[in-house]
């Protein structure tokens, strides 16, 4: 097994260094990110940027990126954005509108930004926090 970390020069834009290190460690040890080839690029408070270099394994029979690849990258970016708020979240709803499709050799850059938070009462003394995450893939 290679000792080369999965992330390369992840940019820290003002995030606490301990939280930054924790998130980078999560990515490095997470086999999911290694298998899907999603790489962490930048972290800030409420913000995460990931990249995915498109290879043949990401393509459908037409030579275009499969829709599930976009969803995987978007979910990864959203999860990292949750972590920058020092929270752990679950994605309960994700909808994508794909305007165009990338091909082999493209690097998909995905940004996730926490826009807002709302709280709803589930039971007396029990609250659920809902985060709105804006995701942009270029």
Model-derived regions: residue spans:
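HotDog/MaoC-like acyl-thioester-processing domains
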Residues: 1-17, 102-104, 109, 114-138
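Non-catalytic linker/capping segments at the edges of enzyme domains
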Residues: 1-51, 55-57
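A generic structural signal for short beta-strands and their flanking turns/coil linkers
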Residues: 34-36, 46-48, 90-94, 106-108, ...
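Hydrophobic beta-strand-centered segment that forms part of the acyl-chain substrate-binding groove
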Residues: 79-109, 114
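Compact, glycine-rich, soluble single-domain proteins
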Residues: 62-79, 91
């Amino acid at each position: 097994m290679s000792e080369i970390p999965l992330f390369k020069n992840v940019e820290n834009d003002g995030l606490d260094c301990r939280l930054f290190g924790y998130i980078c460690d999560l990515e490095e040890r997470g086999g999911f990110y290694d298998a899907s080839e999603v790489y962490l690029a930048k972290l800030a408070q409420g913000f995460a940027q990931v990249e995915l270099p498109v290879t043949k394994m990401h393509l459908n029979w037409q030579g275009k990126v499969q829709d599930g690849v976009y969803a995987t990258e978007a979910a990864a970016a959203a999860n990292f954005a949750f972590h920058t708020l020092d929270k752990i979240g679950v994605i309960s709803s994700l909808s994508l509108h794909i305007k165009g499709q990338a091909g082999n050799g493209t690097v998909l850059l995905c940004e996730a930004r926490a826009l807002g938070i709302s709280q709803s009462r589930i039971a007396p003394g029990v609250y659920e926090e809902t985060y709105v995450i804006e995701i942009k893939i270029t």
